[in-house]
Amino acid sequence: MRALVITLSALFIFMQALILPAAAQGDAPAVEQDIKDHASCPLCGMDRGKFAHSRMLIEYEDGTKYGACSLHCAVLDMAVNLDKAPAKIMVGDYDTKKLINAETAVWVIGGDKMGVMSKRGKWAFATKAEAESFIKLHGGQLADFDAVIKAAFEDMATDTLMIRERRKMMKAKQHQNS
């Protein structure tokens, strides 16, 4: 009987060793294909995986794609490529980090969460309830896609100055440490 208990215990430990790594792998969030294809923002170099909650993917009618870290960089690309019409514009849902349709998303402008590449946050949500829940916690106002694009362009000058100042400070800090 004792040998049977030891054998069953050993078998249980062996099975755990086989099962647990697979379960742990299954629990890890899968990296979305757009992040694999466009790991960093071509404009600023930021990691799109790290900023999955704000990333954007623009698919143009000519078949080209642009993966940006944020609305800020996406509107810059659309402004530079005026002759290329976007066929599809996707954005990371703030809560789930999954890509959703940017034009039908419920957006929140402002609040106490600083934006990505922007002082004023501009966040996308799949549902109005999620956006309203964010507003209760962090403030801001509901907006549609047209309003958020307009806000991004309105903020462009001050955001660009802020980014330049940050980069200048980072460069000075790097120079100081070397």
Identify the meaning behind each predicted range:
Residues 139, 144-177:
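N-terminal targeting pre-sequences for secretion and organelle import
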Residues 92-155:
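Thiol/selenol-based redox catalytic cores and closely related redox-interacting motifs
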Residues 37-39, 54, 64, 87, ...:
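Envelope-exposed proteins and targeting segments
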Residues 65-111:
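Mid-chain, structured segments of secreted extracytoplasmic proteins
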Residues 1-4:
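Positively charged n-region of N-terminal signal peptides that target proteins for export
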Residues 6-14:
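Hydrophobic helical h-region of N-terminal Sec-dependent signal peptides
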Residues 25-83:
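N-terminal secretory signal peptides
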Residues 13-22:
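C-terminal segment of classical bacterial N-terminal signal peptides
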